[in-house]
Amino acid sequence: YKTGNATTITDYCGNAIYENGVLVKVLTGDGYITASDNQFHYFIQDHQGNNRVVVAQNGTVEEVNDYYPFGGLLSSSLSNNVQPYKYNGKELNRDNGLDWYDYGARMYDASLGRWHAVDPSGEKYPALGLYAYCKNSPIIRIDPDGKDDYVVNANGVVYLMRKTDRIVDVLYASGI
């Protein structure tokens, strides 16, 4: 990305993030570690995996986020530049004025509540549209990777709607 005349090249190597060849942070399941000072920053998430609060290792609240149902930022207090992982824990890409979330399989536009690529399993649900996010029910559903959505109850339990051969489905079926 460009800021003024300066160009920054970001590389993602697993959980490590490099900018211009220098390690800047390492992502973990609970937050991230900044390489410049080796400090841990914790994500406090809601039942859908939305990063609601970011807390520094010393207990200082660095960021508080509130979301519209389809993932648009309703408000973000303190510094909006603390970290880019927001709705469903996905990276919010603000390049060129676009607020798109990167789900891996495809990009998502929260202002439209739509994907920017066809649903890979869209032939199974043609009545819902090929670009609809979470069957137009973002309050009770999540889509962890842009490929399939799941129901989430108020306790944060994910209910599998379709059985596949994926390991997470096999584990779910086994009761683990």
State each model region's role:
Residues 1-2, 19, 54, 115-117:
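Short hydrophobic/aromatic-rich beta-strand segments that constitute the beta-sheet cores
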Residues 2-3, 17, 151-152:
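Short aromatic-centered micro-motifs
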